[in-house]
């Protein structure tokens, strides 16, 4: 039995028990064997980290909302306590993101074989820098945003040339890059453009979509379409607000009135 077999089994066991810290620990040990990861193994690693960071991101959203409410109430002691708690969760997020990025850079990218695994790892790297950008500020936010974009662009170059438009990894990459542009770069126009291009290209190739990828690919396509609808609606609302303000300002300032 290969050394990785016991570790992979433990990772699967930990996943079933929803003990994601132990799942990640087991899969990190597999990565450090320097043998590269199989498709199943890299998915296990991704699922473990996704659940770990997902819980922290959800906590951050809740804490951020509470912090705003306390600021509105003007309760300084509560604001201070909430801010301290937020910083605690930020530190935990920082560690998770830095750990996975280190594993990717040190063990996974150097041992990736083929376009699929390369795109997977660079996409994952972009994702975790994006999660850092969600709470970093100032120059730190700029730095991690640039690192996220660099990783996404590296993944995208390979995906465009070596993966089909309906490949779930390529579609997932397009989905996450578009989210990056909307939420981190505050560029919904660019986000919509990327999401629409990915969706349209995939639709054109649907007849050749393999049965193996059908479920995953169509699910991501639906997410792309949902995001497009949401972002276009938000931009339309913003445009209406701007027109209303312009009309009001114009009427007040028009010398011919």
Curated annotation (Swiss-Prot):
Pfam assignment, any one: 14-3-3
SUPFAM superfamilies on file: 14-3-3 protein (SSF48445)
GO biological process: protein localization; signal transduction
An example Gene Ontology CC term for this record: cytoplasm
Domain of life: Eukaryota
InterPro entries xrefs: 14-3-3, 14-3-3_dom_sf, 14-3-3_domain
SMART domains: 14_3_3 (SM00101)
Family the UniProt entry places it in: Belongs to the 14-3-3 family.
Reported function: Is associated with a DNA binding complex that binds to the G box, a well-characterized cis-acting DNA regulatory element found in plant genes.
Protein name: 14-3-3-like protein GF14-G
Originating species: Oryza sativa subsp. japonica
